[in-house]
């Protein structure tokens, strides 16, 4: 897949795309397809780990900053669909033990679902609360909601219902992956929803420290040369999100 993306980049290099809107529009459709395919491959890889139950290698980190950074990076992309993204936290900073790559992946999955099912003019809210030695991270939306009889099966692998997945891509792996991440942290995932009234997904994590502090090394996120935020939201974004100015 990386080789195909490289070949397309050679046929439509960035400097030409910046000066040719028609070429950029056509190349954006190709990039959108590449990102969706890579996201699917990554989800299939993560799904292969669903049977593992060993605890994740957590570190003491600032969870508020981690969530805030993801939301800040996503706001411009949400604006392309005219959906408001808001982040709220009960504390400006809060250190606890968690595996940062996994929590970022979980949040990406929840944001992607919320954006996918929220129409223009709607809103998505990410909220952090700290209650009775538990951390509550919730993502709520004003989207179409979910039928009550579907909620017990949301975290089942490969669930694919027409009412829940109107777009012709995805295998229903995102929520099972989220639940698995929660369980490997010693936490839980719950879903609340009503048709026409939106949905809320809440991650609950033990609010504790492990005694091993985060080491702020330079972070290297490979992702095959792809923009990690575009990759995470690829299923929910319109083609213009993959124009050259967003890829840079």
Language model: regions and residue ranges:
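Conserved glycine-rich
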Residues: 186-187
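Short flexible loop/turn segments at helix-to-beta-strand junctions
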Residues: 21-22, 51-61, 65-66, 97
